């Protein structure tokens, strides 16, 4: 019996360009736009700029259910609640 050749999973509508590449492009653009200015908190900036829309979109997807959103994110609900409060999203 011949096995079917493996194919990329397109059942979920996988994006043509991986998320990682979008993030890399955004970071490159941000660093270029610094135009020689010093920045000593790029890590925190990137985390904040990624987490805020991530939390908003996952919560919307889960119809505001924080327990489901936390499970989908793979974090504890208390961590999600702490982050939402930290970002003023509550």
Swiss-Prot record:
Stored PANTHER family: DNA-BINDING PROTEIN FIS (PTHR47918:SF1)
A Gene Ontology biological process term: regulation of DNA-templated transcription
Protein name: Putative Fis-like DNA-binding protein
GO molecular function: sequence-specific DNA binding
The entry's keywords: DNA-binding
Signal peptide: none
Top-level taxon in the UniProt lineage: Bacteria
Similarity remark: Belongs to the transcriptional regulatory Fis family.
Disulfide-bonded cysteines: none
């Amino acid at each position: 019996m011949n096995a079917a050749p493996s194919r990329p999973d397109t059942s979920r509508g996988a994006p043509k360009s991986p998320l990682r590449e979008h993030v890399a492009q955004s970071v490159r653009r941000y660093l270029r736009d610094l135009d020689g200015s010093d920045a000593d908190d790029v890590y925190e900036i990137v985390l904040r700029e990624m987490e805020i829309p991530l939390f908003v979109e996952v919560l919307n997807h889960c119809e505001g259910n924080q327990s489901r959103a936390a499970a989908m994110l793979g974090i504890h609900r208390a961590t999600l609640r702490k982050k939402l409060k930290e970002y003023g999203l509550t």
